[in-house]
Amino acid sequence: MGSLVLTLCALFCLAAYLVSGSPIMNLEQSPLEEDMSLFGDVFSEQDGVDFNTLLQSMKDEFLKTLNLSDIPTQDSAKVDPPEYMLELYNKFATDRTSMPSANIIRSFKNEDLFSQPVSFNGLRKYPLLFNVSIPHHEEVIMAELRLYTLVQRDRMIYDGVDRKITIFEVLESKGDNEGERNMLVLVSGEIYGTNSEWETFDVTDAIRRWQKSGSSTHQLEVHIESKHDEAEDASSGRLEIDTSAQNKHNPLLIVFSDDQSSDKERKEELNEMISHEQLPELDNLGLDSFSSGPGEEALLQMRSNIIYDSTARIRRNAKGNYCKRTPLYIDFKEIGWDSWIIAPPGYEAYECRGVCNYPLAEHLTPTKHAIIQALVHLKNSQKASKACCVPTKLEPISILYLDKGVVTYKFKYEGMAVSECGCR
């Protein structure tokens, strides 16, 4: 598995190097091939590192975390996300103290745009069609069907409209009864409508069953009838379901799921941050004694042997070029990803910049390996490169994006913003 942290760090360092902290350059205006000559200094101390490989690895890790195989190809027309999904994103983006019940939230819209409701003896039927696809490794926490009810009544006479709503699943016919429809009741409830508004129905069990079946296309039917079995009197008011695709009240199927990968991702990120410490250059330096046995004593001995050479370097470090976190704003439009990333338009990712010369400051939390590496480099720069200024603590961001036309919200996309830097 590629190193997400290292590739992100490499990309951020490159962007800052080219634009000096400004938003990412327009890749179309500056082809990668033309700029490769500028990158030599950035990776001069990392033998065998190919920049194109780093960029591709970063892209692959980003898409993998979002369960995408490639950058989604979207229609040129701008997709208007459901108001509910925008409200959801804005709520958790502004209120850091709250969190959703699941890490991933998908909204599936009604695909049946041509069928009309049917009325018979006070019963109104609304056909709905959803294409639902949930990865098998995810756990469905909750699912709900959101319907916008249209209440029509004489406000001078009636306080509200009293109706019973039943949600059916239309099952596939088997055997010789292909012409017959089998209906399964998913949920039923009573509504006293006074104003047009959203109503929510729990369909969690059905979505879990759909996920296991592997089938993506599912048909529902909404029945609305009077509570007292009398024929609906238009003069007493009506309650309907808004199924029009021309507005923002189209029926929605909202699925809350958890990929259960947050803990695993955090552990992998920590491992990735130190994986580059296994440098082949150190294998030939005869430093085995530092990793086993009296490591502290050996470290002190090496320090005393080369401390005389550090005075001038310490003066240079005091000029403020030491390893630290610096601003780096990522603009999704600049890199052409605004066609499928709905929100945010960009974010402050930060980056780690500066040198890790000896002596390594305590606030940079250097590992023993980093200290040894810095000492070896101080003694002979040809044998080992300097310790690297890298992220040691990362924070997630929330993202609202399109996945094959499905508006999807991910509360925690791990490892996207640097919160602390150190020498490794």
Curated annotation (Swiss-Prot):
Tissue expression from the record: Detected in mammary epithelia (at protein level).
Maturation propeptide residues: 22-316
Glycan attachment positions: N67, N131
Keywords for the protein's UniProt record, in alphabetical order: Cell adhesion, Cleavage on pair of basic residues, Cytokine, Developmental protein, Disease variant, Disulfide bond, Glycoprotein, Growth factor, Secreted, Signal
Keyword Glycoprotein attributed: yes
SUPFAM superfamilies: Cystine-knot cytokines
Signal peptide: 1-21
An example Gene Ontology molecular-function term: receptor serine/threonine kinase binding
UniProt-listed PANTHER family: BONE MORPHOGENETIC PROTEIN 10 (PTHR11848:SF39), TGF-BETA FAMILY (PTHR11848)
Protein name, as recorded: Bone morphogenetic protein 10
Species, as recorded: Homo sapiens (Human)
